[in-house]
Amino acid sequence: MRKAPAAALALALLASAATAQRSGGPFTVEGSGRGFATLQEAVDAIGEGTGTIQIAPGTYRMCAAQNAGSIRYAAREPGTAIFDGVACAGKAALVLSGREARIEGLVFQNIAVPDRNGAGIRLQAGNLVVSESLFRDSEQGILTHDDPASAIRIEQSTFSGLGVCPENGSCAHSIYIGDFGSLSVVRTRFERGRGGHYVKTRSPRVEVVDSSFDDSEGRATNYMIDLSNGATGTIARNVFVQGRNKENYSAMIFVGPEAQSNSSAGLAIADNEATLAPGANATTFVVDRSGETIAIDRNRLGPQITKFARR
């Protein structure tokens, strides 16, 4: 008669252990329900596969490196999962080298490393989608290597208080995209830069639309958009406000300042609004070094902003 209660107790203990394993930490892999104490453990559990990591609200002083697979990193509640001040391999809070990564609702802040390139995300390879995320008060928001076969899309996100230009060193930027196949920036805000450019990219195809660039509280900043090697695509329906504290105030958008290895023929810059903050120096809206035909139409430019120049 006593065996039945003992068996029931054993089953209860097993169920309790299984529940503890599923809820073992703030990083939960969907599907399996397994919880992990660190983000790296959750990433390693997905490995070369495909999966989603749900991240509980909290401030995490940790980082992770994804070397394979396709992973979605999603805050359970947008804006409540914060990665603060820790970089893997002296690079970033997330170092991504897998097939694909999706970042949803995360916050990256206070990332700094010895070479002054500390980023929320260092993308070394693979496709990347970032949405509803915040990058703030770090040396860089997103920094990438080159991967011409892959694409990057950033939407409904904010980049604030980023960038640095150390003496005798290379600048860091709000985002610095290498030679990726394409870059799309949609409904995103850039503000309060602390050096460098807001958007710097070597991608041959770009889309920057329905976004805002508020440089009124920027410090030692450069261009709003730097298409370093030239690019085709669209820059449209954005709002630009250039501030007074600039390292380089000569242009808002510069096409091909470093090289002309990408075609810029047909690049469309249209339906944007650009103004100067009080006390800001006169500037040029678009400066081109590609020598190709660029379509610059229907932009609303405030006083002391020249439409176009070639240099």
Model-derived regions, located:
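Bacterial N-terminal signal peptides that target proteins for export
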Residues: M1-A7
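Bacterial N-terminal signal peptides
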Residues: A7-L14
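Acidic Gly/Asp/Thr-rich repetitive segments characteristic of extracellular carbohydrate-active
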Residues: G24-M62
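Extracellular beta-strand-rich solenoid/capping regions of secreted or surface-exposed proteins
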Residues: D44, E48, Y60-A74, I82-E104, ...
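Right-handed parallel beta-helix
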Residues: A56-P57, A74-A81, E100-N110, N127-D137, ...
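Extracellular beta-strand/beta-solenoid scaffold signature
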Residues: G85-L94, P114-R122, D137-D146, P166-I177, ...
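Leucine-rich solenoid repeat scaffolds
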Residues: N281-R311
